[in-house]
Amino acid sequence: MDFRTLAKRIIMTLLALLILPYLLIPVYALPFIRPVSTLMLADLVTLQGYDRRWVPLEDISPRLVQSVMMSEDGQFCFHGGVDWNQMQSVVSNALDGASTRGASTIPMQTAKNLFLWNGRSFLRKGLELPLAIAADFVWSKKRMMEIYLNVAEWGPGIYGIEAAAQHHFKIPAAKLSSRQAALLAVSLPNPIDRVASKPGRGLQRLAGLIERRARASGGYVGCVLD
């Protein structure tokens, strides 16, 4: 095989990998499809296995939905996949040399979980943004939340809220209390180091804040809990 043929095959493979997620997004809109994340696939390939028990949105405690939205994406019901105001603020702070916090919305996190890889990079973010916009356009907000809560990582080999609720609190996701829901929500950014069932003082304080915000969430969660 000459260099030109090899280069052509590599380019075609990369193009196929770039296009594939956009073909899967409308497929994942179908309610009977249960997507898996790239981390789950990695666990399978490395023979580690994982625990994920898919549950429909109606079988998940509304307290958990409220807590996750208030912790991860308070504008979920109002943006089209990307919170451009928050994104602009993060970019401005970065250019000024100030510390920044993430601007990843729930659609962006879902796109990353389903199609991309962990770790911060401009390349991943550049791929993530259009995928989030496409998914938010094709899926309903309820479907987006259902997929997100069923593929999110909540510990080593623990994926989805049902497996998380059973692993950390020995109860189904439908029966999570306000505090349990808040603890699971605030552990999402770093589920390996933040253990919902063994929270330190800092995690307890953060969970208390999210618990209060969840109680007052009102119209902020209407697109999912109407």
From Swiss-Prot:
<dbReference type="Pfam" id="PF00912">
    <property type="entry name" value="Transgly"/>
</dbReference>
<feature type="transmembrane region" description="Helical">
    <location>
        <begin position="10"/>
        <end position="30"/>
    </location>
</feature>
<dbReference type="InterPro" id="IPR036950">
    <property type="entry name" value="PBP_transglycosylase"/>
</dbReference>
<keyword id="KW-1133">Transmembrane helix</keyword>
<dbReference type="GO" id="GO:0005886">
    <property type="term" value="C:plasma membrane"/>
</dbReference>
<keyword id="KW-0808">Transferase</keyword>
<keyword id="KW-0573">Peptidoglycan synthesis</keyword>
<dbReference type="InterPro" id="IPR001264">
    <property type="entry name" value="Glyco_trans_51"/>
</dbReference>
<protein>
    <recommendedName>
        <fullName>Biosynthetic peptidoglycan transglycosylase</fullName>
        <ecNumber>2.4.99.28</ecNumber>
    </recommendedName>
</protein>
<keyword id="KW-0133">Cell shape</keyword>
<dbReference type="InterPro" id="IPR011812">
    <property type="entry name" value="Pep_trsgly"/>
</dbReference>
<comment type="pathway">
    <text>Cell wall biogenesis; peptidoglycan biosynthesis.</text>
</comment>
<dbReference type="GO" id="GO:0008955">
    <property type="term" value="F:peptidoglycan glycosyltransferase activity"/>
</dbReference>
<keyword id="KW-0812">Transmembrane</keyword>
<keyword id="KW-0472">Membrane</keyword>
<dbReference type="InterPro" id="IPR023346">
    <property type="entry name" value="Lysozyme-like_dom_sf"/>
</dbReference>
<dbReference type="GO" id="GO:0016763">
    <property type="term" value="F:pentosyltransferase activity"/>
</dbReference>
<dbReference type="GO" id="GO:0008360">
    <property type="term" value="P:regulation of cell shape"/>
</dbReference>
<dbReference type="GO" id="GO:0071555">
    <property type="term" value="P:cell wall organization"/>
</dbReference>
<dbReference type="GO" id="GO:0009274">
    <property type="term" value="C:peptidoglycan-based cell wall"/>
</dbReference>
<keyword id="KW-0961">Cell wall biogenesis/degradation</keyword>
<keyword id="KW-0328">Glycosyltransferase</keyword>
<comment type="similarity">
    <text>Belongs to the glycosyltransferase 51 family.</text>
</comment>
<comment type="function">
    <text>Peptidoglycan polymerase that catalyzes glycan chain elongation from lipid-linked precursors.</text>
</comment>
<dbReference type="GO" id="GO:0009252">
    <property type="term" value="P:peptidoglycan biosynthetic process"/>
</dbReference>
<keyword id="KW-1003">Cell membrane</keyword>
<keyword id="KW-0997">Cell inner membrane</keyword>
